[in-house]
Amino acid sequence: MPVTPPSLFPPILPTRQGMLAVDELHTIYWEEVGNPDGIPVLFLHGGPGAGLSPQHRRFFDPNSYRVILFDQRGAGKSTPLGEWRNNTTQLLIDDIERLRTMFGIERWLVFGGSWGSTLALAYGEAHPARCLGFVLRGIFLCTSAEIDWFLHGVRWFYPELYDEFVAPIPDDERGDLLGAYARRLLCNDPKVYWPAARAWSRFEGRRVFLLPQEDEQSSDTLDLGVGRLESHYMANGGFLEDDQLIRDLGRIAHLPAVIVQGRYDVICPPLSAYRLQRAWPGAKLRMVPDAGHGALEVGIARGLVTATEQFKRHGRFD
């Protein structure tokens, strides 16, 4: 497993946790951490489908922040696991608003990495009056070019990993690799969807870090959530118009933001972070020279904690 960066705050347990039924199908897990009178912050995990980790609570000073975290529909402890029906970006945004209302929060800092950065931007552009600012990492704008890179661009860096991912798919289906995996992942036969889920999760997980890490134990929860929901969202363009997040950036451009990006991120390459900052001159782009995609890589974790420390002191990122 990756070494825990020294810059993180000590492990902490939730002060409250529970389940919230958001429709007739989905129930989402939530937790609250830190000071109930602190600065409200919303943590958005990646994937989609990756779910929460106890480490996610540790980017924030628990004496200064009131941290709200939740497993998005179909992820982690939310039920049903891997459920893609009634699961869209707009519905996730609605869930965030349900949580904000439930907790009685007027405005909050929004913190998200990878797919979490996508959802953070989409939420902010839908509800700018509810946001204090943004801490974003590993930017994914969910454009068609980024989706194509995720599936095919990696072969320039990890050709053996790409070949392993493609190998189970018959030759006549390889012209639409995303469609081929989605058909397998979203079917009802566990003998079909489990191997596909594990292959998808390996394909992504083995390129998260710049430097190789010891293999972690496989998690069925992670594999099924990530495989099903990433393929579902990518097949639908993230339920966004192409480049919508850049187009609508004016709605949040007045708010403070910091972007922490690994220079050698081969899942969400730096071009997207660069494009976002160019369109958002007030945002601070902090390129980490010796990191890939992982939030727990030392330089990225340090950058994220630095950002939350700056915001608690000044309400901005300088």
Regions found by a protein language model. Give the residues of each.
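Catalytic active-site module of serine/aspartate enzymes centered on a nucleophile-bearing elbow/loop
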Residues: 283-318
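A catalytic-pocket lid/entrance helix-loop region that shapes and gates access to the active site
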Residues: 131-181
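Conserved alpha/beta-hydrolase
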Residues: 61-80
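Conserved alpha/beta-hydrolase "acid-adjacent" motif
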Residues: 266-272
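The serine-hydrolase catalytic nucleophile loop
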Residues: 48-61
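Conserved hydrolase catalytic core segment
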Residues: 106-148
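Short beta-strand/loop motif that positions the catalytic acidic residue
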Residues: 252-253, 259-261
